[in-house]
């Protein structure tokens, strides 16, 4: 099973990806983990990413795609993977689909976790309180959601047009949401 989890900040992508990894016995790939691993390994891509990040810039699509290609050659992805937080824009989605076609591992499903904006703000504010994070003010959260809507929401349309998208209600108990995702990807 090769799966992409999409959804705005606070929708529960990371939580559900961790649960699905255990349930399905497949690798969980997050861009943050990939970046940290490449930088720690001192690879050429890691050095490039570190230089970009140290300058306060976003890592380019080309560097991220190179890291993804490297990650997909590792043994733990042989049974499949869950991508969480990637692709973030249509250019990344196009490039990733090309890469997956080249290596003969097309996506099986793309799941969009749908959660109302006000609930997302409440969830993230609650998480910020628990973790003592000041950068998750309601205003900052709304800004992150706006960036998501501008850049990442078009990826949902991209996969809907290809017939690989399943929309799942991301509200409820964790077990209920997991069951909805499993039903959507097996249906």
UniProtKB/Swiss-Prot annotation:
ATP binds at residues 10-15, 127, 172. Its main location: cytoplasm. It catalyses: AMP + ATP = 2 ADP. It is found in: Cytoplasm. GO terms for cellular component: cytoplasm. The keyword Kinase applies. Belongs to the adenylate kinase family. This is Adenylate kinase. It comes from Stenotrophomonas maltophilia (strain R551-3).
